[in-house]
Amino acid sequence: MIFSTLEHILTHISFSIISIVITIFLISLSVDEIVGLYDSSEKGMTATFFCITGLLVTRWIYSGHFPLSDLYESLIFLSWSFSVIHMVPYFKKHKNYLSTITAPSTIFTQGFATSGLLTEMHQSEIVVPALQSQWLMMHVSMMILGYAALLCGSLLSVALLVITLRKAIRVFSKKNNFLNESFSFVEIQYMNERSNVLLTTSFCSSRNYYRAQLIQQLDQWSYRIISLGFLFLTIGILSGAVWANEAWGSYWNWDPKETWAFITWTLFAIYLHTRTNKNWESFNCAIVASIGFLIIWICYFGVNLLGIGLHSYGSFNLH
């Protein structure tokens, strides 16, 4: 009873803190002058990390097994994984763009886990015999960590696509006006008008330079995180195959979860391969990673809606 109450308290505290962090972070985006807001949001994410960690440990002690046996517990672990990814660069004193991805992802997964859809899973139950194995921690934790890293990397690629497309649309729509008005020095009659045009052109060039730097950094961070997530995913699939052979006598059974895990692995293997091809631009690679964002959610969450296959123990009903 004590552990159940503590788990309930930690769940709501972590959700409340991350909600405040999101609010602070949105304010800091619009008000750059307030330096303390960024530090406050980072401290809030640290507090969220410890709350979710305490929640997982409490549920582990209360249930007697590692908390990864159903969708609710895996969502909590996914939320914890997002907070870990957020904090690693922070402790290394590297300010990056991950916070724009990890903080909303944490509140989304934490909010859904505590929603009414998964109320039946909030109470810990005895795990099915197939899950009573030491491979549970190895396999599922690696898969969830892989999903978290791949989702973050994919969202960075989506951001790269949005910035690039906005730039292309802006250049296309203003190309004629820019050429006619900014560079038609014949029509400029006074020196001060020419000076204004040069200042405007210089400002545009400076803005384009910083946009190019932003795109490059997003591309680099996306590649690094996806590479890490791909490693976790590979370890998770291999450990799952060994576990399946022990439990069911076969390394691979092509049930829906395994099939979509293989599709996910293949897609990001293609992404990493395209990164080695110098003829492929970052925009094209980002398209592949963006498709991977949808594939991951189908693999992790969409397949659970079917409620069939060897992984049906992680499914839930919408009624």
From Swiss-Prot:
Q: Which residues cross the membrane?
A: 9-29, 48-68, 71-91, 98-118, 143-163, 225-245, 258-275, 286-306
**Where located?**
Plastid, Chloroplast thylakoid membrane
Paired cysteines (S-S): none
Q: Name one GO molecular function term.
A: heme binding
The domain of life for this entry's organism is: Eukaryota
Q: Which GO terms describe its biological process?
A: cytochrome complex assembly
Q: How does it assemble?
A: May interact with Ccs1.
Functional description taken from the UniProt entry: Required during biogenesis of c-type cytochromes (cytochrome c6 and cytochrome f) at the step of heme attachment.
Q: What protein am I looking at?
A: Cytochrome c biogenesis protein CcsA
Q: Which UniProt keywords apply?
A: Chloroplast, Cytochrome c-type biogenesis, Membrane, Plastid, Thylakoid, Transmembrane, Transmembrane helix
Q: Which GO terms describe its cellular component?
A: chloroplast thylakoid membrane; plasma membrane
How does the record say this protein sits in the membrane? Multi-pass membrane protein
Q: Pfam families from the entry?
A: Cytochrom_C_asm (PF01578)
Q: Which family does it belong to?
A: Belongs to the CcmF/CycK/Ccl1/NrfE/CcsA family.
Q: PANTHER family from the entry?
A: CYTOCHROME B_B6 PROTEIN-RELATED, HEME EXPORTER PROTEIN C
Keyword Translocase, does the record have it? no
Q: Which residues form a coiled coil?
A: none
Species this protein is from: Eucalyptus globulus subsp. globulus (Tasmanian blue gum)
